[in-house]
Amino acid sequence: MIEPLSSSYAEARSAFLEAAAQAGSRIESFPHPLKGLGGEDLAIDVAEVGPIDGDQVVLVVSGTHGVEGYCGSALQRAHLSTLGDGEHAGPTLVFVHALNPYGFSWVRRVNEDNIDLNR
């Protein structure tokens, strides 16, 4: 079941990191230099499940257009919740949460430089 959408970037990030930890993911965060709408720290978070040296990788990205991050984050969390404790058989799964954390927090399609990352 897909949980309701988060009401803010900070809430979505916290829920994603919790879901990733519960799935036994390897997690790495890449801080963003600016602050979010509520003064929160911004980051691109990456959770990886499965073989470290796997030949097959599935990349799942949310928030390329920041405002779309709310839905993408919920879908990533839903997928992570199906994985159990990290004993994933199959391709390595890499979840990139909030590729555009500034746009996600400020509810904008574009990043802090008014650039659409998908163009």
Where do the language-model regions lie?
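Structured catalytic-domain cores with a bias toward divalent-metal coordination
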Residues: 1-119
